C-alpha cells in the first residue's frame, strides 16, 4: 500500500533551499558559520548543538533590526551563515530546515 506524499508548503521549500546553500558536504549536520576574528571560514556541526535558535539582532551592528539563526554549544552562540531575515517567521522556517537537513538520512 502506498501513501500519497504530503504537499510541502512553499515556505518550507524556500527555507530548505536557503539552508542547503550553506551545507558543508563532509558529513551530516555540518553548516557554514560566520567566522570570528581572523578566520577565513568556519563550519559547525548542528547535530552537536544544544539548541538552534532565532535571534533578533537589534544591537548587532552587522544586522541591525534583523533576524538571524544561531546554534548554541553550551554557553557559546555561533551565527550560522544564513540570512539575515526581515521577519521572525522566515528565520524560524530556515532554522527548521537546517535541523531537517542536519538530521536527514539523505545526506552523505
Q: Which role does the model predict for each range below?
A:
Residues 1-13, 103-108:
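Short intrinsically disordered terminal tails
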Residues 2, 39, 80-81:
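Short, flexible active-site loop motifs that bind/organize anionic cofactors or intermediates
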Residues 7-68:
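Short N-terminal "domain-start" leader segments
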Residues 8, 12, 76, 95-97:
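Terminal low-complexity, poorly structured segments
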Residues 38-39, 73-77:
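Glycine-centered tight beta-turn/hairpin loop motif at sheet-sheet or coil-to-beta transitions
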Residues 77-88:
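A short, exposed loop/beta-hairpin motif centered on an aromatic-Gly-Thr core
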Residues 86-105:
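A short, charged, amphipathic alpha-helix used as a generic interaction element across diverse proteins
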Amino acid at each position: 500500500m502506498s501513501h500519497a506524499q504530503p504537499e510541502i508548503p512553499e515556505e518550507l521549500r524556500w527555507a530548505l533551499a536557503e539552508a542547503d546553500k550553506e551545507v558543508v558536504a563532509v558529513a551530516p549536520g555540518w553548516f557554514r558559520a560566520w567566522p570570528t576574528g581572523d578566520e577565513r571560514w568556519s563550519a559547525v556541526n548542528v547535530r552537536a548543538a544544544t539548541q538552534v535558535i532565532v535571534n533578533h539582532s537589534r544591537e548587532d551592528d552587522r544586522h541591525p533590526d534583523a533576524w538571524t539563526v544561531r546554534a548554541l554549544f553550551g554557553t557559546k552562540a555561533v551565527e550560522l551563515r544564513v540570512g539575515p531575515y526581515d521577519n521572525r517567521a522566515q528565520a524560524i522556517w530556515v532554522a527548521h530546515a537546517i535541523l531537517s537537513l542536519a538530521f536527514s538520512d539523505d545526506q552523505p
